[in-house]
């Protein structure tokens, strides 16, 4: 019952914000958001309708915001993999972009300096096409050690400060490490976990859409 009511409340809140969005930007047309990332965007282990892209699109559509979320997530992708395919993904001509990458870099123990370099190259490409960017941060798992974790987190903080982006500090905020919100692997969110991510990131997505040029 709580989950159902919470979902209704979220849709209500987003509807109010969505009305403001249309009033401020005048966007009556359907906007295209490119969600570019790894398995967290792709919806690993879930039916398509339960993945992040579909749940985000459905939630905002129900709130009256005409939005198409393009799922450009690839399971297992690293920052290097993302850099190699970003030009192809931009062929979708999105109005705005959500960038979420790096989780697999940390799981593989890749040097944070390399992750930072790759993400900066991606951000530079995105800025060149002149669309607003929502940049989602990531935190390394505890087993990678405190020193690595701090260095990895600084990558996102420094990139957010150096680039013109909306910054969402941790994509898995409130979900990581919570068993009931994750699949059996303890890494990928389940349907309820994805909904919580959508609930938390929705205001940032709406702010992103407000910045889309008419």
Regions found by a protein language model. Name each.
Residues 1-13:
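Bacterial N-terminal signal peptides that target proteins for export
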Residues 11-21:
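Bacterial N-terminal signal peptides
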Residues 27-75, 85-93:
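Serine-esterase "nucleophile elbow" of acetyl-processing enzymes
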Residues 55, 65, 81-214:
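Alpha-helical cap/lid subdomain in secreted, periplasmic
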Residues 76-80:
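N-terminal helical cap/lid subdomain that shapes the substrate entry/recognition surface
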């Amino acid at each position: 019952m709580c989950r159902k009511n919470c979902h209704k409340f979220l849709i209500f809140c987003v509807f109010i914000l969505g009305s403001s969005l249309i009033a401020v930007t005048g966007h009556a047309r359907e906007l295209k958001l490119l969600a570019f990332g790894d398995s967290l965007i792709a919806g690993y282990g879930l039916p398509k309708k339960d993945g992040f892209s579909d749940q985000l699109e459905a939630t905002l559509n129900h709130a009256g915001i005409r939005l198409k979320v393009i799922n450009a997530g690839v399971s297992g992708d690293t920052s290097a993999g993302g850099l190699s395919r970003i030009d192809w993904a931009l062929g979708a001509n999105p109005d705005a972009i959500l960038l979420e990458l790096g989780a697999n870099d940390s799981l593989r123990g890749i040097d944070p300096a390399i992750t930072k370099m790759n993400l900066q190259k991606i951000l530079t490409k995105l800025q060149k096409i002149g669309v607003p960017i929502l940049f989602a941060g990531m935190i390394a798992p505890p087993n990678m050690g405190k020193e690595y974790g701090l260095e990895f987190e600084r990558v996102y903080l420094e990139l957010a400060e150096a680039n013109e982006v909306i910054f969402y500090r941790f994509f898995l905020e409130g979900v990581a490490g919570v068993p009931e919100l994750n699949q059996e692997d303890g890494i990928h969110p389940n349907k309820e976990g994805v909904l919580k991510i959508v609930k938390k990131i929705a205001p940032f997505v709406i702010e992103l859409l407000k910045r889309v040029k008419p």
